[in-house]
Amino acid sequence: MESQQLHQNPHSLHGSAYASVTSKEVPSNQDPLAVSASNLPEFDRDSTKVNSQQETTPGTSAVPENHHHVSPQPASVPPPQNGQYQQHGMMTPNKAMASNWAHYQQPSMMTCSHYQTSPAYYQPDPHYPLPQYIPPLSTSSPDPIDLKNQHSEIPQAKTKVGNNVLPPHTLTSEENFSTWVKFYIRFLKNSNLGDIIPNDQGEIKRQMTYEEHAYIYNTFQAFAPFHLLPTWVKQILEINYADILTVLCKSVSKMQTNNQELKDWIALANLEYDGSTSADTFEITVSTIIQRLKENNINVSDRLACQLILKGLSGDFKYLRNQYRTKTNMKLSQLFAEIQLIYDENKIMNLNKPSQYKQHSEYKNVSRTSPNTTNTKVTTRNYHRTNSSKPRAAKAHNIATSSKFSRVNNDHINESTVSSQYLSDDNELSLRPATERI
């Protein structure tokens, strides 16, 4: 009866054999599948006895390897082959552009023979494999007890980054290199390589490893064809074909220069002048901005500079707009000269212009405030009393008296002058004043 059931269900043989093998130690020279069917009940009886002694049961490593035996239990995941990094498949640039890359993890997996031996700038093959970009895992070694369940755990990165990093677009022209390098630097920063990229001052936080250098070199070539690079980049790579960091450092410096150019353009477009500062200071400011733009190969014509300056004039300088509106040949030096002339004229007029309201210095207000009272009492004293404080009637009397006295004196003086002149002309004698007789 039992043999018929075994023939009807042959898989039960493997199940019974597996239970007996895993629960009882078997000699290394004996195949667990070679046990006859007649001895199966005996193995089953032994297995019930051994199940109560699980503490002394050996591990699965005691079971000899058998290629014909398929175990229903999943095999344990082997430890990583390269330290803390795990092996990942390679991907071509076309696949990388179609789907987001993962983060930087295993740069040593790249084939870097050309990086070590190539005498010139290497042109990558369109199907050149590029690694996945996965962040570094934790440096702590895995616990050997948890190796069985390692396949179900998700490795955690050191830093919080996105799940995917979008690769930079391929460089299409030499003029777009300054824009492309911004995306490439952002691509490296999002991939946990920002600490090896030079900052605005050309400083880096740490030295990059050989694998990181190889990765930067290969990704730079994959997305920046050599014939589309600017001349200054080609000159650097002709000296040292792998000196990508120097290219990035100078690119960052040029970005700062471009930012200064933008600031200069904004300052030139928003010029304002109303005479509150000297004309010389205004001229120096404008000339410095124009000269700085010229050093960066940006020439500002006199006509454009004059239009921007005239737009910002106000006050007494505003009428210069109408004067230069019909002019076709504008000279910046001439405009500065006219601004200086108006500024000097206004300065002279302000010095000679009398004040509309005279300040009476003879009056002095003295305010006294009592600290104990809330009301403020103001007392005005006239320390210098003048004639202006007399009543109007007294003023009129004094004026009439003084005018009458002046007329009498003037008539007397005129009469005596005429008589003395008449005597001197006729008799040529000088009269002495009469003296009183005693």
UniProtKB/Swiss-Prot annotation:
* Protein encoded by which gene: TY2A-LR1
Species of origin reads: Saccharomyces cerevisiae (strain ATCC 204508 / S288c) (Baker's yeast)
Could you name the domain of life of the organism this protein comes from? Eukaryota
Q: What is known of its domains?
A: The C-terminal RNA-binding region of CA is sufficient for all its nucleocapsid-like chaperone activities.
Recite the UniProt keywords alphabetically. Cytoplasm, RNA-binding, Transposable element
Misc note = Retrotransposons are mobile genetic entities that are able to replicate via an RNA intermediate and a reverse transcription step. In contrast to retroviruses, retrotransposons are non-infectious, lack an envelope and remain intracellular. Ty2 retrotransposons belong to the copia elements (pseudoviridae).
Taking the first listed entry, what is the main subcellular location of this protein, grouped into a coarse class? cytoplasm
Composition bias of kind Polar residues appears in 1-11, 19-39, 49-60
Q: Which Pfam families match?
A: TYA
Q: Example GO molecular function term?
A: RNA binding
Composition bias, Low complexity: 369-381
Q: How does it assemble?
A: Homotrimer.
Record's protein name: Transposon Ty2-LR1 Gag polyprotein
Q: Where in the cell is it found?
A: Cytoplasm
**What does the protein in this record do?**
Capsid protein (CA) is the structural component of the virus-like particle (VLP), forming the shell that encapsulates the retrotransposons dimeric RNA genome. The particles are assembled from trimer-clustered units and there are holes in the capsid shells that allow for the diffusion of macromolecules. CA also has nucleocapsid-like chaperone activity, promoting primer tRNA(i)-Met annealing to the multipartite primer-binding site (PBS), dimerization of Ty2 RNA and initiation of reverse transcription.
- Any one of the GO BP annotations: viral translational frameshifting
- Site: Cleavage. Where? 397-398
